[in-house]
Amino acid sequence: MASVEYLIKQFLTPDKKQLDLSNQNIGDKGAIKLTQSKNLCRLKKLILPNNNISDEGITAIANSENFKQLTDLDIYGNVISDDGVKAIAESPYMSNLKKLSLYGNLVEDEGAIAIAESQIL
């Protein structure tokens, strides 16, 4: 796997509003690295399918001020469970989210209820 900073340079759109890291296998360590990049503070769309991200990685993303402008979060095909979805549903930084793609994860009723009842989303 290439370094996350390299991937950001390669796949961040010129306007810095979209990052597509589909199928890069960044895992939780890579997801956490994303939260530390100041190049992503204008990001509107974050595309992370099939990256082996679990609750740890998505919780870091959900709790990062870097992503407070996100409107679109594609995290399908990872290993995120109810706890990770709850982190998204409860994070004040996810308040602009309009689209959340979760299919192919480990989300069950508890996570779905957290999204449905969220006062933030």
Question: In which residue ranges do the predicted regions lie?
Answer:
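Short, solvent-exposed loop/turn at the beta-strand->alpha-helix junction
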Residues: 1-4, 24-32, 51-59, 79-86, ...
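Structural register of leucine-rich repeats
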Residues: 15-19, 32, 41-44, 59, ...
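N-terminal segments that cap or nucleate solenoid repeat domains
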Residues: 1-52
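Concave beta-strand-loop units of leucine-rich repeat
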Residues: 19-26, 47-52, 63, 73-79, ...
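Residue-level signal for alpha-helix termini/capping positions
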Residues: 12-13, 39, 66, 93, ...
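Generic structural signal for well-ordered alpha-helical scaffold segments
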Residues: 8-9, 35, 62, 89, ...
